[in-house]
């Protein structure tokens, strides 16, 4: 399935694979 990217960025990192930081939350790449 597709990654769920709802977590808050840690600095500029997202821990979920396939997600990138769109501050303050992570978005799917």
Swiss-Prot record:
Protein name: Cliotide T15
Tissue specificity of this protein: Expressed in root nodules but not in seed.
Protein family (similarity comment): Belongs to the cyclotide family. Moebius subfamily.
Cysteine-cysteine disulfides: 5-19, 9-21, 14-26
GO biological process assignments: defense response to bacterium
Cross-link (Cyclopeptide (Gly-Asn)): 1-29
Entry domain remark: The presence of a 'disulfide through disulfide knot' structurally defines this protein as a knottin.
Post-translational note: Contains 3 disulfide bonds. This is a cyclic peptide.
Physiological role: Probably participates in a plant defense mechanism. Active against Gram-negative bacterium E.coli ATCC 700926 (MIC=0.5 uM) under low-salt conditions. Not active against Gram-positive bacterium S.aureus ATCC 12600 up to a concentration of 100 uM under low-salt conditions.
Entry keywords, A to Z: Antibiotic, Antimicrobial, Disulfide bond, Knottin, Plant defense
Taxonomic lineage: Eukaryota, Viridiplantae, Streptophyta, Embryophyta, Tracheophyta
Source organism of this protein record: Clitoria ternatea (Butterfly pea)
């Amino acid at each position: 399935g597709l990654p769920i990217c709802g977590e808050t960025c840690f600095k500029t990192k997202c821990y979920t694979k396939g997600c990138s930081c769109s501050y303050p939350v992570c978005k799917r790449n």
